[in-house]
């Protein structure tokens, strides 16, 4: 009996997992990587692998995500972690919170990438770098029969196969698609991931009438210091404003526009919809010392996210009074009088314990901006990966616009969308769980 031949397009987290899992399931596997080496956006991450602890936890964290895909994500995650450990991957339990379980790749994502790539190749797999999948081939029998590949940006060749699994990493580096789904200010988004994630999987699948998932207008990312600051691509984590949920965000009019306590990834999407995709993050000395100054840990270096961002050139001010802070930020095109009124109204609501009743409610973390000195930092969205993509079923099969599986076509990782929507509960877990599921189904059907 001939072994099934599977082509996996993209060698990031999802692609590496998929390729090794398909190989273990008895398939002959070719793994394509658009760049010069495997890794994708995983290589730029901190290597944190996490997921919601229970299905109920996931529903609270991501209430608008796909229910059935979310259930599979949570239920399969522990087995995926056990599988990685059995392969020899070093995962350290980083912390266990009431609603999530977190692991850290040790000594970092680079070791994971090397280990998985070597495991794949030593098992007889073919890894082709500088090889971008550009087109899916379709047989007379009505199923995927191969893929066209551009090698080194020039030569093209076709690879015949029985199944194709798309793991190209989303479309966050595709300006046209960002404009289509994220609107007027999408060109201001700072790419904090793989620059080769240009929606290749999405575009190839559209030729086969593939359906879009939900969440096409959502992305996962974090706030970064605003221009003229330019964050070094190797050091995104040190400058990321994870603590925005502890502060107050205002737009250039000096007005709040979102419930900051929903989380930095939600704040990032909200800022992307504001004029110029710019906002100012405000907090007092208590928040600065507790959250803005970070110790080394979780794969990241120690950093002072305010002063290091200011040193890069981001609009910023420190003052001993709110009046002085508002006046200082006027030099950065912020409406100072509106900012002052916003902060006074907010502080009064905190004092009266009625922040949930503000025009823009604040439901958690009602930290007052009351202890000097006070800090203001211009911020802008950084995009890591898109939450929308191809619609899949629980086996990772790509569905057409009628809701039927496209024979021979699968997707995992950021190419498969709708699992998260607006909010987020782990990124690498998507590649782990649905990469394994797609591999198993593709190798056995």
Stretch-by-stretch model annotation:
Residues 2-4, 153-163:
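Core beta-strand elements of the Rossmann-like FAD/NAD(P) dinucleotide-binding domain
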Residues 159-228, 428:
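Glycine-rich loop(s) and the adjacent beta-strand/alpha-helix scaffold that form part
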Residues 12-13, 36-37, 343:
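Residue-level detector of alpha-helix initiation sites
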Residues 202-204, 211-334:
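An anion/pyrophosphate-binding glycine-rich loop and adjacent beta-alpha core
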Residues 4-31:
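N-terminal Rossmann-like FAD-binding beta1-loop-alpha1 element of flavoenzymes
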Residues 135, 338-419:
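A glycine-rich dinucleotide-binding beta-alpha-beta segment and adjacent secondary-structure elements
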Residues 204-211, 431-445:
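Internal hydrophobic alpha-helix adjacent to the cofactor/substrate pocket in enzyme cavities
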Residues 27, 34-126, 131-135, 249-250, ...:
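Conserved N-terminal/central alpha/beta ligand/cofactor-binding core
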């Amino acid at each position: 009996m001939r072994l099934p031949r599977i082509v996996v397009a993209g060698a990031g987290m999802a692609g590496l997992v998929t390729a090794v899992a398909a190989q273990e399931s008895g398939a002959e596997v070719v793994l394509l990587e658009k760049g010069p080496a495997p890794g994708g956006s995983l290589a730029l991450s901190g290597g944190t692998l996490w997921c919601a602890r229970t299905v109920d936890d996931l529903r609270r964290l991501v209430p608008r995500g796909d229910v059935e895909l979310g259930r599979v994500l949570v239920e399969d995650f522990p087995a995926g972690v056990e599988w990685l450990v059995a392969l020899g991957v070093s995962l350290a339990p980083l912390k266990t919170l009431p609603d999530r379980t977190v692991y850290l790749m040790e000594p970092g994502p680079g070791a994971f990438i090397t280990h998985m790539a070597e495991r794949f190749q030593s098992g007889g797999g073919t890894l082709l770098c500088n090889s971008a999948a550009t087109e899916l081939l379709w047989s007379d029998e009505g199923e995927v029969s191969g893929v066209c590949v551009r090698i080194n940006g020039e030569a093209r060749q076709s690879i015949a196969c029985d199944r194709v699994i798309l793991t190209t990493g989303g479309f966050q580096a595709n300006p046209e698609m960002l404009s289509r789904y994220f609107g007027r200010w999408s060109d201001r988004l700072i790419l904090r991931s793989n620059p080769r994630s240009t929606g290749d999987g999405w575009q190839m699948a559209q030729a086969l009438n593939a359906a879009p998932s939900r969440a096409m207008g959502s992305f996962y990312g974090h706030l970064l210091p605003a221009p003229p600051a330019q964050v070094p691509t190797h050091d995104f984590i040190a400058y990321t404003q994870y603590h925005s949920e502890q502060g107050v965000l205002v737009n250039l009019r000096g007005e709040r526009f979102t419930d900051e306590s929903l989380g930095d990834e939600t704040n990032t999407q909200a800022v992307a919809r504001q004029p110029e995709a710019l906002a100012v993050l405000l907090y007092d000395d208590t928040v600065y010392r507790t959250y803005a100054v970070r110790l080394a840990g979780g794969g990241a270096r120690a950093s002072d996210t305010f002063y290091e961002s200011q040193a890069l050139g981001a609009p910023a001010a420190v003052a001993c009074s709110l009046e002085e802070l508002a006046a200082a930020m006027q030099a950065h095109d912020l409406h100072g009088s509106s900012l002052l009124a916003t902060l006074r109204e907010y502080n009064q609501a905190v004092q009266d314990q009625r922040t949930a009743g503000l025009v823009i409610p604040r439901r958690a973390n009602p930290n007052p901006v009351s202890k000097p000195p006070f800090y203001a930092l211009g911020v802008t969205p950084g995009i890591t990966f898109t939450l929308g993509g191809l619609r899949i079923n629980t086996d990772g099969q790509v569905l057409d616009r009628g809701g039927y599986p496209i024979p021979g076509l699968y997707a995992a990782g950021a190419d498969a969308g709708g699992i998260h929507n607006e909010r987020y509960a782990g990124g690498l877990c998507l590649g782990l769980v649905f990469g394994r599921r797609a591999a198993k189904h593709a190798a056995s059907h």
